[in-house]
Amino acid sequence: MTDQELLTILKTDLQVSSPALDPYLAKLVEAARDFITTEGISLTSSYSDSMLVEMYAAYLYRRRREENVQMPRMLRWALNNRLFSQKGAVTDG
């Protein structure tokens, strides 16, 4: 999924239509990738990983705009499942 497609999905999720926020949202996508990588997850170009980045970026946006926003359980579970599937994968070698 391209960054532009990811940005479009993020804007739809957040119900934002103005292009004025595009640079900020693009930086949130970059930050989301960095935060996910910091948790030990190696992202791929798959749609499921792209959607994980989108969910995390949406969480970052909502956390900044509202008080006391906790990480949604579905996002925490998705991160944990992705990490566990990566760590549990059998590699040749």
Short names for language-model regions:
Residues M1-L52, R62-R65, L83-G93:
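Conserved short "hinge" loops at termini or chain/domain junctions
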Residues R65, V69-A78, R82-F84:
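Domain-level detector for trafficking modules
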